[in-house]
């Protein structure tokens, strides 16, 4: 996990939310919601109608998974699927969802980490 701004309170709330899941949910995924006009690698719209483009504030969010995952034990033993078959979503705020994949990501995370620990955010 490379989310350096994820705090222990959020992790505790995540575990509590998992423990409170209804029986029909087999996983809890911490996700990063993103709203915008998304296209696939061919340029095909994913979440909007290209003939009638709405403002992004009218679009449903899409979610990036892989931030944190908890699975029911029986599911984890039976499958190698880290998303579950009927997951519930646990949205993270933008700072806590920040992932480090590049040098720029690292520098941005370092900037916000320092600001948070200085009490500025």
Model-derived segments and spans:
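Hydrophobic helical membrane-anchoring modules
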Residues: 78, 91, 96-121
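Conserved core of the sugar-phosphate nucleotidyltransferase
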Residues: 3-93
